[in-house]
């Protein structure tokens, strides 16, 4: 009985130490600048923080094992379909997930969005400490909106951040706020 109690107590103490583990990484919010970074996308293009600071950008961190990410990714695909050719630059970046599992999931879902498979948290921690999905809508280098899993953003939520104005040479985006 005493051995069971000690095992139970040890387990509880281990769990508590995990809960109090110091979180690392930034905690970027609305108004913060996009950090410097560089990632190679699955299509071979390189996306940098410098590039994303020019105009409007959508940065998403995800893992395909995350149910909230799986719920959000189809909305982001629709957002990508409608706005990638109209001045919005996209960077979908995995958090601790390799190329093979993402590639399999993308194929199953018929996603066409380019992504960067990152097997560590190095890029993620420039932006956040916890939680995926995490979506940043930015304009001219500043974060203008942040979406997480509470609640999961919809296509309408993402589009609502943008105010689309017709222009002679295409579509000009002006972020609300």
Q: Which residues does each PLM region occupy?
A:
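Short pre-active-site segment immediately N-terminal to redox-active cysteine/selenocysteine motifs
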Residues: 55-57, 62-66, 131
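Thiol-/selenol-based redox modules, centered on thioredoxin-like
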Residues: 137-177
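Short, internal strand/loop/helix patches
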Residues: 106-140
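Conserved redox-active cysteine motifs that mediate thiol-disulfide chemistry
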Residues: 61-77
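A short beta-strand-turn-helix
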Residues: 38-57
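Thiol-based oxidoreductase modules, predominantly thioredoxin-like and allied folds used
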Residues: 87-99, 111-120
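Sec-dependent bacterial lipoprotein signal peptides
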Residues: 1-16
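N-proximal helix/coil linker or "cap" segments that precede and/or mark the start of modular domains
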Residues: 18-36, 177
């Amino acid at each position: 009985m005493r051995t069971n109690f000690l095992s139970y107590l040890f387990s509880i103490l281990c769990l508590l130490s995990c809960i109090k583990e110091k979180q690392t990484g930034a905690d970027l919010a609305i108004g913060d600048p996009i950090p410097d970074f560089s990632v190679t996308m699955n299509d071979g293009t390189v996306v940098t923080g410098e590039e994303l600071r020019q105009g409007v950008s959508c940065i998403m961190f995800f893992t395909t094992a995350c149910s909230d990410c799986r719920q959000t990714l189809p909305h982001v695909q629709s957002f990508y379909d409608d706005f990638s050719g109209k001045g919005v630059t996209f960077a979908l970046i995995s958090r601790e997930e390799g190329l093979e599992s993402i590639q399999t999931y993308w194929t199953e879902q018929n996603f066409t969005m380019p992504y960067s498979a990152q097997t560590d948290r190095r890029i993620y921690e420039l932006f956040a400490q916890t939680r995926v999905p995490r979506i940043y809508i930015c304009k001219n280098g500043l974060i203008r909106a942040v979406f997480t899993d509470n609640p999961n953003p919809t296509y309408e939520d993402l589009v609502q951040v943008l105010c689309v104005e017709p222009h002679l040479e295409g579509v000009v985006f002006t972020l609300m706020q």
